[in-house]
Amino acid sequence: MLQQILHDMYIDPELLAELSDVQKHILFYKMREEQLRRWKERETWEALAQDEGLRPPKTKRASDKHIQWLLGADGEVWVWIMGEGPGDKPYEEISEELIAERARLQAQREAEELWRQKEAEITKKFRDALANEKARILAEKWKVEMEDRKAAKVLEERIHEEFKRKEEEERKRGEEQIRLQEEQRAKELYWTLKQAQLHCQASEKEEREWEEQLRRSKAADEERSRRAQRARDEYRHHSLRAIQKGTVAGLSSMFRELGQSHEQEARLYHHLPDPGLPQPLALPVRTWERPLRPVSRDVIVRWFKEEQLPRRAGFERNTKFIAPWFHGIISREDAEALLENMTEGAFLVRVSEKIWGYTLSYRLQKGFKHFLVDASGDFYSFLGVDPNRHATLTDLVDFHKEEIITVSGGELLQEPCGQRDSPPDYHLLFE
């Protein structure tokens, strides 16, 4: 389009109206430049024509326009010498006008050059201002993120202190309840023994019945002591699990359940039949009791099948296929060997042997990084790195394909590292 305008030295007024001021200045500059080029070309040919008798070349236009020389009465080209004809200006005046025109054109070129310099300065000024504004926005964003993390840490510490306080209160209530039960039972045994002493003169049959009654009472006491000890152990175990999970709701629910179990035990204790006929309580049997930490590979496999398979850990989203980044129980060295020949950003997720969760192994430009993923609760999150919690393991991986794991490292999950051997290293988990 620009070449066509410069060729015709004409632009449609509607098109000109749509141009900005800067574009109009540029177009004007280009058209003047083209005029000067043609003028200089013509001057060169005129000089050659004077020296060698040549004529300027005809410019072929797209519209097939041409020039026809005016002929005089003698049939030759009609010639008019400027300044010598009737009514012409003197040569000196014409020369002055040409000099003035050249001076005007030179001043115009200098003005255009100054405008280009000014335009470059304006562009650089606004480009620098835009860069500074972007830097300021990034700095403010980083500051807000740091403040959010500090607030989250303070909240976590406050929740932890609340856990400890509630645990101590519940422990005191449990100990007080056991103490009251022991005192009440001691009174009952005292009166039982007292009555037995009063009837010591009874017959031999009554003596045997009394001994049998005493034996059963002691057995009932031992059974109640064992139940109390089991309740304390179960309370301690659930307290540790609640702290590991990091949820107030889980601990509160456990407190309510423990309180209900203590109340139920107290009600059963008050409604026990005669000590001569003790009835043992039937305690529920749990099929899977997870240890505090993994103790063997068999326990890890069972944990994965019991708790992680129902949550679709290791599967792609909304499919029955196992994710390419998922691996089984492999060591740190095996993970680094798999990532050795891959580029920065490659990663895999393997089942951890240290915690109830996983380890995300990440390939750096030089070396590797390993991040622990906690899966002991109802969510998945990095330990000590990222406070974000995710409903599934796939959600965590997809989230960090777009968001970095740490601000200092800038780790972004890019290329999953798949299986190299057959059968795959996770086959024991899905058998």
From Swiss-Prot:
Could you tell me which species this protein originates from?
Answer: Homo sapiens
Region annotation (Disordered) maps to 211-234
Please state every residue range assigned to the domain named SH2: 325-417
Instruction: Note whether Chaperone occurs among the keywords.
Output: no
Q: Which UniProt keywords apply?
A: SH2 domain
SMART domains membership: SH2 (SM00252)
Q: Which GO terms describe its cellular component?
A: cytoplasm
Q: Which CDD domains match?
A: SH2_SH2D4B
The name this protein carries in UniProt is SH2 domain-containing protein 4B
Q: Name one Pfam family in it.
A: SH2
